Amino acid sequence: MVLMIVSGRSGSGKSVALRALEDMGFYCVDNLPVVLLPELARTLSERQISAAVSIDVRNMPESPEVFEQAMNNLPDAFSPQLLFLDADRNTLIRRYSDTRRLHPLSSKNLSLESAIDEENDLLEPLRSRADLIVDTSEMSVHELAEMLRTRLLGKRERELTMVFESFGFKHGIPIDADYVFDVRFLPNPHWDPKLRPMTGLDKPVAAFLDRHTEVHNFIYQTRSYLELWLPMLETNNRSYLTVAIGCTGGKHRSVYIAEQLADYFRSRGKNVQSRHRTLEKRKS
């Protein structure tokens, strides 16, 4: 059984995530004090029910040791996973402005900007041990729920999921990435007027990139690097490995390379997902 702990900065989508998990059959509890986690897990273990619990800055323990002790006291029947939701500062400010809700730390007479920054510092112990960090800055409510359903229902328990995502540097580097590879030095289909409207998912763009030796070399060396360290990452009790591939706009080169790497590791029997940030943004 899974004990999914949902945390993250206020306004990043914890309530949405908890509702999505409830739809997936999890027994959900909002804002449970950390010290009560073992007791809840023992109660649910008798009923063979997976659980999801949200923890925010209001019920954070005073020291990380309290959280570690609670994790160590969980029944063996439960496999704990920590999901951390985040968004960039400007997005959080905009969301609070749209909803006109008060930030949980506003009672300390802090400005909204200062409350967001302080919350980030207070939640760092949880963020640093998260199994999965999700950046919701560019996601709608429905996109976040669907992404969680895909990632959580599409993976086998305790198996590392490799996530290959493309992005454009001009839109910013994904904060959920474990590895970031820059492919802006590779030949750019953008300068071919016929290829410019297309994406890295289209065959003419793929054929253009496939003609260049340096593209093949990059794919080979990148997958070799990942293959070298993958066994150690798998034995390190990780649930996800997110590899971000970036080009200038996130439309051609990064999309093609991310798909090539995803196809390669998928053919090797790995649990693989792919995502293209710029293309998803264009659809929304």
Swiss-Prot record:
The lineage's top-level taxon is: Bacteria
GO MF: ATP binding; GTP binding; RNA binding
The record's keywords, sorted A to Z, are:
ATP-binding, GTP-binding, Nucleotide-binding, RNA-binding
Q: Which residues form a coiled coil?
A: none
Task: Locate the region RNA-binding.
Answer: 266-284
Q: What does this protein do?
A: Modulates the synthesis of GlmS, by affecting the processing and stability of the regulatory small RNA GlmZ. When glucosamine-6-phosphate (GlcN6P) concentrations are high in the cell, RapZ binds GlmZ and targets it to cleavage by RNase E. Consequently, GlmZ is inactivated and unable to activate GlmS synthesis. Under low GlcN6P concentrations, RapZ is sequestered and inactivated by an other regulatory small RNA, GlmY, preventing GlmZ degradation and leading to synthesis of GlmS.
NCBIfam families hit by this protein: PRK05416.1
Q: How does it assemble?
A: Homotrimer.
The UniProt similarity line reads: Belongs to the RapZ-like family. RapZ subfamily.
Q: What is this protein called?
A: RNase adapter protein RapZ
Gene for this protein? rapZ
